[in-house]
Amino acid sequence: MLFDSVPSYITGMFGLMGIAAITKKRGGYTNTKMHGILAWSGIILASAGMYAIYQHKNNMGKPHFTTWHSWTGLSAFGGCIGLGLVGGVVLHPDFGLDTTNKQIRAIHKYSGRIVLMLAWMATLSGLKTLVGDDIKPILLFAVPLVVAAPFTLL
């Protein structure tokens, strides 16, 4: 039952991460703080999804992390947590250790784009596993990602 909610958690994470990316592009103190809040909200949703997946595998007696989909998803999840920690500890506008370091900011920015692309790949490969050769659901999910890509990745 909990496993059925995984797509909602992961889609919610995408929505929050996309909005967080767009919010940050506008710049400024308030947008930077909102970027962190939205991103960590997305991480919390993704955590619920990861928990549901892990418990589902345990309940079925299946091994964990045996597919490209699972490793890509785990990499994206770990990347989100790492970026969130760097953002919160190093780049936070109120108490960050090095808020003006342009190199750290650039690494954070481009790493975020890579992690978001990994998350998209994991989600699309998971959807492909669920729907098989039916291309319509994949297109319905992928087209909004393609439309949103210029706003979140560029």
Where are these regions (language model features)?
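Membrane-embedded alpha-helical bundles that constitute the cytochrome b-like, heme-associated redox core
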Residues: 1-154
